[in-house]
Amino acid sequence: MAGALLSSCSGQKDGNNNNKKETTMKTINLTKEEFLTKVANFEASPNEWKYLGDKPAIVDFYASWCGPCKTIAPILEELAQEYGDSIVIYKVDTETEEELAGAFGIRSIPSLLFIPMNGQPQMAQGAMPKASFKEAIDKVLLNK
């Protein structure tokens, strides 16, 4: 995985955060039920990764109280707009979706799951600068 991994949080607090402007491309909050239908149904196929999406994706496992999560939130919003229809960026609030976070062994946030159309997803932990996100998107997700 490309890029320097900077900082992350571990622990607990509260919350939710994800409003943006207009109807331009933006990050999408997911519940466990939505994850099972849009990303991967790990309950039906616990031993095999089967991506259900129609474009590469990033899943940001975050919490609203986490400083590094707050740092990358606007970066992810910018990337969602910049890459438009090429990728989708999902967000999973680890405070409200504890079972989903547990299924992926999330112990440190932010944790980012990079999901290419083919092959296995890759997990990265900690905040990254925008340039590192772009490098990972281009190499891992878009094969540029």
Predicted regions and their residues:
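N-terminal targeting signals for export/organelle localization
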Residues: 1-36, 142-144
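Conserved helix-turn-beta segment immediately C-terminal to the redox Cys motif
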Residues: 53-56, 71-92
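Non-catalytic, surface beta->alpha helical segment in thiol-disulfide oxidoreductase systems
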Residues: 108, 113-144
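Structural signal for short hydrophobic segments within the conserved structured cores
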Residues: 26-28, 88-90, 122-124
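Short pre-active-site segment immediately N-terminal to redox-active cysteine/selenocysteine motifs
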Residues: 54-57, 61-65, 108
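A short beta-strand-turn-helix
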Residues: 30-56
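Glycine-rich active-site/cofactor-binding loop and its immediate structural neighborhood
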Residues: 89-106
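Conserved redox-active cysteine motifs that mediate thiol-disulfide chemistry
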Residues: 61-75
